[in-house]
Amino acid sequence: FLSVWNEAAEEGARGASVDNINTLFVACLSATGTETTLTEANPAAPVAPAVIADAGLTATQLAIKATIKKADDSYRIRFMTPVRSKIGITIAARVPTSYVATDVEAQIREAILAEYGQAAAASRRGYNRPLYQRVYALLKQKIVALSGGNADLVVTIQDVPTMAGRPELWRYVAADSLAVTVAT
């Protein structure tokens, strides 16, 4: 996960401060996963990121800092803890009786988790927000049972206003935040 933002985005999320002038903010989690993260269990109760002191930076964070400094050494760089936040998605599908409901349910889960799960490329960038249009198109493209004229699909994506403009959020769909029902 990697998210980099400037003082305007930071002040949009947490208010103005003179400490933010000429600062780039970074929240990251490397492949080794040694960086500290916070978890937001309830999106209606936001968890604020913590500032990571320079002495507590990991090798990955130090490499990111060096790369930014090499490109432009006029910026101050402040690392923040990423905040994990699961995206709740509910999918209700109706398919023709010629399909096995449990098989279609497994295909839906596989498609959503591949596209929006924790390991997905889209989730590893900041500001991940599944859009209804993309979810419907993805499911109809990947799952034959949903592409026919006798299939129906209803998708509900949890969207909490407090999530808007929070660049430190690592948002992804998890197996336990995805509810799927399929009827024939």
Regions found by a protein language model. Name each.
Residues F1-R129:
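Carbohydrate-recognition loop of C-type lectin domains
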Residues V100-T184:
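An aromatic-glycine-centered, glycine-rich loop/turn in mixed alpha/beta architecture
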